């Protein structure tokens, strides 16, 4: 989840109240966020530069607060403070309005058809009469960075541009041109660059080079102009220096270019609802008309409040508490959601919720129910056992088998689901036939593939515990991962049971006895084999027959057949395999697929 850094004193001033750290942690928890760390700005710098130096008493305290990923409206101090003020009932829910502007005076953004080749959408808005101080200005910039990193997916979906409107002249145009046709002075630079030159220039920039791939291979680059052909920005890379906002900026023009229109609307709404509080007319935003080449035009931002009806029973039953309509509406008000009792045609009591443009996370009755639970307090919800609780058959069988094998004096181990490619195949004398699920970008060679069997983990466990007295008897019941084209993700989990005996002798008879015991407790009878190796009533029980698996010693291994289906193998582990895992003593091993028995 994203984390924001806010000055403690500024936050408390915005809340209109000071808190001890313990009390503030309680407030955060009750609101559904978390105080992650308490530090200072200088301490952060010292940590980054690895400097050992004592902290000064006058250093500003910084709170690092973890924010839910679905709440972009909380990604800056201003948005967080506003939400907390409403939560502690020190402020009413803001009402956002569009400025009343005549058709002939509204700012225009004209979109050229070429933009469809690279970044087809743009949404805009204006904040009039904004008052910036240094802290608020920095927060305004930080909010853009946080949005870029999260909902904008590192600018690939949406790129935000903010400009001093007084330095520009409308109407504006959004175009897509060859990079050689675009020239402008970028932000924090003094000379003009051609767009293709700018791409090369920023390849050495630690911050901007990670965004270049979004457009650098495109034949056209997106660019925004005003009526005097002054470049506003080259999204998603950099804004122009001409329209850079400063502490003296009063009128801010915000444009968001995007490949995802829905995300662009959310980002724009987050920006304007958070900082319209500091406009000359509080919570009023000036709209911009965006006109496309097909003649269709749209007014942005879309500040419409949409309504949602949620049955009261859904809320109370899901949470597990009994609440009246008045209590629910009061709790929702604390979460910035206006609510009232709905007029229902049937006898069912429902809550009508008015979702403001700042709450893009409220999409379903579940979201409303969650907000009621947060405001009510999770710690206040009585614990109870769900009436419908029932373990899955597979998990219930797994637990019973764990107990039974433990009573056979085997110790349970839990090993990694990931292993090296070599452990999956070569170290088990198996050939690689592209049958393993591979990790795309492994951090370590030890974790580059999903295990296809439990054998590597158990052998590694014994190999690392050779110094302990023998015999070693261990088992594991866990999942392995197989390629599976029938699944939408291309793979599926299978629950396997494995046991290993390591001692002075191979212990083959002990592993064979464990197989028989497992089948006995599962009420699967052993089948009598005829002279022609055909069992009687094959579908009613189990039998074993000679197998030829490379990880086992030839002639000292067997397949387990249950109800006519092969479910696993057991035998004496091949000396080469033991040597690969640095095991000097003989071992016998069993592995079977539990799910195949069900």
From Swiss-Prot:
Subcellular location: Cytoplasm, Cytosol
Reactions the enzyme catalyzes: tRNA(Phe) + L-phenylalanine + ATP = L-phenylalanyl-tRNA(Phe) + AMP + diphosphate + H(+)
Segments forming domain B5: 303-383
UniProt: Mg(2+) binding residues: 361, 367, 370-371
Record InterPro entries: aa-tRNA-synth_II/BPL/LPL (IPR045864), B3/B4_tRNA-bd (IPR005146), DNA-bd_dom_put_sf (IPR009061), Phe-tRNA-ligase_IIc_bsu (IPR045060), Phe-tRNA-synth_IIc_bsu_arc_euk (IPR004531), Phe-tRNA_synthase-like_B3/B4 (IPR020825), PheRS_beta_core (IPR041616), PhetRS_B1 (IPR040659)
GO cellular component: cytosol; mitochondrion
Enzyme nomenclature, EC number: 6.1.1.20
Entries under Gene3D superfamilies matching the protein: 3.30.56.10, Bira Bifunctional Protein, Domain 2, Phenylalanyl-trna Synthetase, Chain B, domain 3
Disulfide-bond pairs as recorded: none
Keywords assigned by UniProt, alphabetized: Aminoacyl-tRNA synthetase, ATP-binding, Cytoplasm, Ligase, Magnesium, Metal-binding, Nucleotide-binding, Protein biosynthesis
NCBIfam families membership: pheT_arch (TIGR00471)
Subunit annotation: Tetramer of two alpha and two beta subunits.
Family under the similarity heading: Belongs to the phenylalanyl-tRNA synthetase beta subunit family. Type 2 subfamily.
Annotated protein name in UniProt: Phenylalanine--tRNA ligase beta subunit, cytoplasmic
